[in-house]
C-alpha cells in the first residue's frame, strides 16, 4: 500500500524533465504545503506533516535507489534545510525536511548528497539530472 494512499495532500513532480506541477490539495486543508512550479507529465509525491517537519514519500516503483543523507545546503543565498531519510520500502523513500532557523521561506532537497547541484536562483536550485539516477537531483520548494 502506498504511503500516499491515506494522505490528503500531494505534490506532483515531473522527474523526467524536472518540472513542478500544481499541488493537489483538498479545500479546507490549508496548513503548511509545498508550492510547485511549471508543468509537464507528473509523478505524485505526498506531503506528510509531523509538527514542524515535513515528509515527502516517493511513490514510484522505478525510483527506489535514493541514498541516505543528512546535511544542510546553501541554495539561492540562504542556508535552508537539513533532511534525513526516515523509512523506505520497495515503493517509497520517506524523508524529513527540517527548515533551519534562518530559513527565509525556501526549502531545497538534493538526492543523493554527492556533487550537489546549486545555483544563484530558484531555477538553478530546481535543476536535476534525470538521465542518471546516480547523479545528484536537486528540487527547489517554496514553504509557506
UniProtKB/Swiss-Prot annotation:
One of its GO terms (molecular function) is carbohydrate binding. Disulfide bonds join 4-46. Keywords: Disulfide bond, Lectin. It comes from the Eukaryota. Gene3D superfamilies: 2.80.10.50. Stored in spherulous cells in the sponge tissue. Homodimer. Possesses D-galactose binding specificity. This is Lectin-1. It comes from Axinella polypoides (Yellow-orange branching sponge).
